[in-house]
From Swiss-Prot:
Protein task: Required for Ca(2+) flux in immune cells and plays a role in T-cell proliferation and in T-cell and neutrophil migration. Involved in endoplasmic reticulum-associated degradation (ERAD) of soluble glycosylated proteins. Required for palmitoylation and cell surface expression of CD36 and involved in macrophage uptake of low-density lipoprotein and in foam cell formation. Together with ZDHHC6, required for palmitoylation of ITPR1 in immune cells, leading to regulate ITPR1 stability and function. Plays a role in protection of cells from ER stress-induced apoptosis.
Swiss-Prot/TrEMBL site (Cleavage) positions: Q82, G83
Transmembrane segments annotated in the record for this chain: 20-42
Keyword Endoplasmic reticulum attached: yes
Organism the protein comes from: Bos taurus
Membrane topology label: Single-pass membrane protein
Protein name, entry field: Selenoprotein K
Length: 95
């Protein structure tokens, strides 16, 4: 990256990419990634054991708040016995 120092345009590539501060920053970045990765795995496991997030009424013990899960809509084939018949398809014979 180009920058200006004392009125002169300098290129930061003149510094060594393997300087000590880069190596230590890289090491601590990897260490923090590993720690956060395993911490999030363990937090997910604790939440599942305690029942967090699986029950919608666990936070509302006094009766206020949203009701339980609404009934699910059934997905499946179209019921042809309800409603009027569709109109005939338009089109010619091709002549």
């Amino acid at each position: 990256m180009v920058y200006i120092s004392n009125g002169q345009v300098l290129d930061s590539r003149s510094q060594s990419p393997w300087r000590l501060s880069f190596i230590t920053d890289f090491f601590w970045g990897i260490a923090e990634f590993v720690v956060l990765f395993f911490r999030t795995l363990l937090q997910q496991d604790v939440k599942k054991r305690r029942g967090y997030g699986s029950s919608s009424d666990s936070r509302y013990d006094d009766g206020r708040g949203p009701p339980g899960n609404p009934p699910r809509r059934r997905m499946g084939r179209i019921n042809h016995l309800q409603g009027p018949n569709p109109p005939p398809m338009a089109g010619g014979u091709g002549r």
